[in-house]
Amino acid sequence: PEFRELLARYEKSRQLGISSYFGIDEFVDLLSYHLSIDKSDEAAAILDAARHLHPTAPENTKMEIRLLLYNGEPQKALALLNGLKFIDEIELLTIKAEIMVALRNFRQAHDIAIELLQKSSPGQECIYEGLEILLDCGFAMEALEICETALRVAPEQISLHEVKAECLIELQRI
């Protein structure tokens, strides 16, 4: 419900051509949403608006990296990532692994995903990201083993069951 309200407020301000205030986290959510529905031009406009309202926010660079990855420019994304300072280590690892997948450097993406998984515990968002990266790199069996281990610790985590299902589906394709 909160995101729908945010999206409605954003779309209304765009339709009316007025500038409305949005927090940087709201811009991050809006950009992610528009990339998920294949509207990279709108995502670029969101990034511009975020830079205008929050010129010093490090999230702007992170959003630009996401946009570059979406647009098939992983080398530029990596260069931007390497220039980032004051970024959370987990977030840095996640973004770097996504860039390595885009560059088709699956071994390095795998190693980063394992490092990410070693720094996480069941229930943390980064465990799902690490498992998804392993799947993206073709390491479905390893992802399944890690997922099953995590489920022994936290069987109530529905997202882990979903990732396990993805692993099993991927293994059937092989």
What is the predicted function of each stretch?
Residues 32-33, 67, 99, 133, ...:
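Residue-level signature for tetratricopeptide repeat
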Residues 50, 83-84, 115-116, 149-150:
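Canonical positions in the second alpha-helix
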Residues 29-30, 64, 96, 129-130, ...:
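Structural register within alpha-helical repeat arrays
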Residues 55, 87-89, 121, 155:
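Short coil turns that delineate tetratricopeptide repeat
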Residues 36, 70, 102, 136-137, ...:
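Register position in tetratricopeptide repeats
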